[in-house]
Design a protein with these regions (language model features):
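N-acyltransferase acceptor-side catalytic subdomain
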Residues: 1-380
Length: 380
């Protein structure tokens, strides 16, 4: 059996040089997604490397010089007072400290098919040997079949693991025709979509501009950000686009994904004014609806968010590459997204903490105490 060589990359220039081999492996890996692509994670590191005290910690597995495994990790150094550990192992693309969560979902180890067990074991052994470099770990928004769930399998650990439910991804299996899709909806929803679309067509002379047909990416991001801020403002919720790093990251990653035909931004205009926008990611046979926004008055009169989503679903049905439409993260299993004939799949966080009293206190405060406070606040 051929030996696997494992190395640790901490230098951004070495990370940059991995682009081609990284993406080749990511495309082959069973759990590889656009969120584990080089374009997404390198752009994230370029943007967020100075957001906090972070250290790049990429674990690279090779066999006969061929790349066969990647653990896309970082070490986040917290203040010494942090409970329950100050050196936290995390996945790249997660752990932003400025409030602008990028939501890099479904991350995992990137492994050559057929070598999952061996590569996971090599990574586990390396991490245990280097445990002086980290004290705990948090891996967020994993799916049920994650390779990370098998990390440290069979090992006697000085750390303890805990899984915590963390929302759902919400999917639509695309039918053969858009008519079939409409018929899958409840009658009230279907009639509302048809009525609003007819109203928009008869009352307004509108156009939809796209970045794949010449709309400048920076213009598109600026307009989308403004519309997202307006939408979130109506809901009295903060917009991630208020955070400069979040917007900078997306300006960067969209420009890298566009030549690969893996991104789309649509801006709907009425009388030249941007009134609705949808930002989507093309990931193999899945379209991820990532961010959206709309202008208040016209947005409600024509249900513009619904229009943008259902028209995007129509485009997906016509695209032979695509078989699923993904609304991405929902905190609630019974989200409004289910009205679009969607279904949910659970996600979870996997945490590793030291076995000590500080951990017990941390878990108590962030478990029953935190939930109790949330309930009390809801009753106010």
């Amino acid at each position: 059996m051929q030996n696997i060589e494992l190395s640790c990359i901490t230098d951004i220039d070495e990370f940059h040089s991995l682009r081609e081999s990284w993406n080749t492996l990511n495309d082959r890996s069973a759990n590889g997604t656009i969120f584990s692509s080089w374009e997404w994670l390198f752009s994230w590191w370029e943007t967020y490397q100075h957001d906090a005290d972070r250290q790049l910690f990429l674990l690279i597995c090779r066999r006969d010089d061929a790349l066969i495994g990647i653990a896309p990790l970082q070490i986040l150094n917290h203040p010494k007072r942090y409970f329950p550990c100050s050196k936290q192992l995390m996945l790249l693309g997660t752990g932003e400290t400025d409030g602008g969560l990028v939501l890099t979902e479904y991350l995992d180890l990137i492994i050559e098919p057929g070598l999952e067990s061996r590569v996971t074991e090599e990574i586990s052994n390396f991490l245990l040997e280097k445990q002086d470099m980290w004290q705990g770990a948090t891996f967020q928004q994993l799916l049920a079949d994650s390779h990370l769930s098998k990390l440290f399998g069979g090992q006697r650990l000085s750390i303890q693991s805990k899984t915590i439910d963390n929302g759902f991804r919400t999917l639509i299996d695309l039918p053969e025709t858009y008519k079939d899709y409409l018929m899958s909806l409840r009658k009230k929803k279907r009639n509302n979509i048809t009525r609003m679309y007819t109203r928009l067509q008869t009352e307004q002379d509108y156009v939809v501009d796209t970045i794949t047909d010449g709309l400048d990416t920076d213009v598109a991001i600026t307009e989308l950000a403004d519309l997202n801020r307006e939408r979130r403002g109506q809901l009295e919720q903060p917009s991630a686009f208020e955070c400069p790093n979040f917007e900078a990251f997306h300006r960067l990653v969209v420009k890298r994904l566009l030549p690969l035909d893996k991104v789309q931004i649509r801006i709907l205009r009425i009388e030249g004014k941007a009134v609705a926008g949808l930002y989507s990611l093309i990931d193999g046979d899945i379209m991820h609806a990532y961010q959206s926004g709309f202008e208040a008055e016209l947005g409600h009169r024509y249900a513009l968010l619904t229009m943008m989503i259902t028209q995007e679903i129509s485009h997906c049905i016509e695209d032979p590459r695509l078989s699923q439409f993904n609304f991405m993260y929902s905190a609630d299993e019974n989200s409004y997204k289910l009205r679009y004939s969607a279904y949910t799949e659970p996600m979870y966080d996997l945490n590793y903490f030291p076995r000590n009293k500080r951990t017990d206190l941390y878990q108590f405060l962030h478990g029953p105490v935190k939930q109790r406070v949330k309930l009390l606040l809801k009753k106010r």
